[in-house]
Structure formats: C-alpha cells, structure tokens
A protein has these predicted regions:
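Structural beta-sheet core signal
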Residues: 2-4, 39-41, 98, 122
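Short hydrophobic/aromatic-rich motifs at helix boundaries and adjacent loops
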Residues: 1-2, 23-27, 109-113
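Active-site-adjacent betaalpha module
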Residues: 35, 47-192
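A generic structural signal for short coil/turn motifs at secondary-structure boundaries
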Residues: 12-15, 130
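Generic N-terminal amphipathic, Lys/Arg-enriched alpha-helix
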Residues: 1-13
Length: 192
C-alpha cells in the first residue's frame, strides 16, 4: 500500500502543469486572507488519493484556516458537509471562486453551485487536468453554463473594486510578488 505522500507525488506528476496550479492557488489564498474571503476545501478520497497539497498550508497552525475541509467521493465539491458549512455564513447568494483539479471532472461538476443561484468564478490559471487537452474544453463548457472564466489577477482586482480600499496595497503587493509566476502560469495554462 502506498503512503499518502507517495500517492500525492504520483498524482502530482500526472496533472498537467500541477506546480503552476499550486502557485496560483497560493497567491489566491494569501489574498483571501487579506480580503477576509472564507476558504472551503475538499479532498477527493483522501485514503486512496492522498491529502490536499501540504504547500497550500490549509488548516496548518500558521496557514490558511478553512471554514470546512471535507473529504469526499462525489466529484462536485458542493457535498452536504461542505454545503452545511457554506450556508452557516448565511443564506444569501454568494460569489464563489473555484480552483483545482481535474478541470473536466471535479471543477466542472461544481456547476451545481450555479444551479443553487451563486455566481461562480473559475480561475483559468488555477485549474488543470491529467490531459492538457481537457482543460480548454472544460473551460468552454463552464463558460457556456454561466460560470465566469477569468484569471487570478483579473479576479483579485474585480474583487477589490477600488484602489482606495485598505487592503489594496497588500493585495497589490501579492500580485507584484507573483508577477513572474503569473506570467509563466498564464503561458502554460491559458492557451485559448
């Protein structure tokens, strides 16, 4: 039996440009902390496929604290346990940002958030699949179904809305820090 770390490393090497997905996700998570955006995470069959990547720092003592970090077998992330935690924030419709793998399976099946009336952003430089060719097909479907397919930087500036907010300087600093990685991530993951 493979250890969770070995399973993660094997899975990591199978995903097209996986380190770039992680890099963009790290940028978004850091900005989420500054902007007080709640974070929800899921892991697909933790016992079989391993833990969510440790470098994201999810629920680590000095890391990103999630509202819920749920293990699941369903392909959508919007499983009952996560849905319960999500609606503990209130019943109003929300804007939801989706990142992760695999774009044509778990990311696409999270369209059920749209059916619940939420606005869904899929971050093109933070999703991928084992087969790179699946990604543009999945993003086209997501867009056709009503999701906003955008980039991490575009989303962050839309989220802030105004350079006059107190968090602007901190988020702009994160964007600047990740500038080179963002350019490389876009070149690798956003071939439309």
């Amino acid at each position: 039996m493979a250890t969770p770390t070995r399973r993660l490393e094997k899975f990591r090497s199978a995903i097209h440009e996986f380190p770039r997905v992680v890099s963009t996700t790290q940028k978004l998570l850091r900005a989420a902390q500054l902007l007080d955006i709640p974070v929800f995470a899921t892991t697909q069959l933790r016992d079989k496929l391993g833990e969510t990547c440790p470098e994201l720092g999810l629920d680590a003592p000095d890391g990103i604290q999630t509202k819920a970090h749920v293990d699941k077998s369903a392909f959508s992330m919007f499983v009952p346990e996560l849905k319960k935690a999500f609606y503990e924030l209130g019943e109003e419709k929300r804007e939801v940002v989706v990142v992760g793998i695999e774009s044509h399976i778990c990311v696409t099946q999270t369209l059920d958030l749209l059916r619940e009336g939420h606005k869904v952003y899929v971050i093109a430089d933070a999703v991928s699949s084992c087969n790179a060719q699946e990604v543009p097909v999945a993003l086209a479907r997501l867009r056709a179904e009503g999701a906003v397919v955008t980039t991490s930087e575009s989303f962050l500036y839309e989220c802030m809305g105004d350079a006059g907010i107190k968090e602007f300087k901190g988020v702009a600093g994160i964007v600047k820090e990740f500038n080179k990685a963002t350019r490389e991530n876009l070149e690798a993951l956003c071939k439309m």
